[in-house]
Amino acid sequence: MIVYCISGKAGHGKDTFANILAEKLKAEDQRVLVFHYADLLKWLCVKLFDWDGQKDEAGRHLLQYVGTNIIRAQRPDFWVGFVADVLALFPDEWDYVLIPDCRFPNEIEYLKDKGYDVVHVRVIRDGFESPMDDVAKRHPSETALDGYPVDAVVRNNGTIQDLEQSIAVVNKGKIAVEDSNEV
């Protein structure tokens, strides 16, 4: 099982990249799971805090507060541990797991320490001005991976079609990203 930890700022196209990559891998007869660290966080916020599911300013602050300020502050490996536990329960279910919301170094290192083949991909959208307020932009969930080593950089500066065309899947799941590092 190869795990792609996909990082990048909010709005840079992490989910879009993951979905395109998933489709390309599936076209190569690979079994793919797209799994977010925040899937459980969102469920908790809906059930425990009556969150309406909107990632507006209030919703994003709630997600950051519960996910980082409360849970990560007490148990830094809670989210990645949950994902690793699920993957350990189903070791032969998927060839590739794509995690499009990697935000902290431990979310990469924990999986490596558990023996997973981890590829860290950073999605960058040059010149994109985030609509988030300054507090949200400076939150550790947006900045913790700034300068952290990556295996590949994906530049998402055009259309979805441009992004799709820049990703080539070759040799049973090995990907190449145009103008980037091969993964």
Where do the model's predicted regions map?
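Conserved lysine of the Walker
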Residues: 14
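Hydrophobic anchor at the beta1->P-loop junction of P-loop NTPases
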Residues: 6
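Post-Walker A helix-loop "phosphate-sensing" segment adjacent to the P-loop in P-loop NTPases
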Residues: 23-33
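A short acidic, amphipathic alpha-helical/loop segment
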Residues: 106-113
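Small-molecule kinase domains that catalyze NTP-dependent phosphoryl transfer to phosphate-bearing small molecules
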Residues: 82, 114, 120-183
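P-loop (Walker A) phosphate-binding loop of NTP-binding proteins
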Residues: 9
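Hydrophobic positions on the alpha1 helix immediately C-terminal to the Walker A/P-loop
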Residues: 17
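ATP-dependent small-molecule kinase phosphotransfer cores
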Residues: 33-97
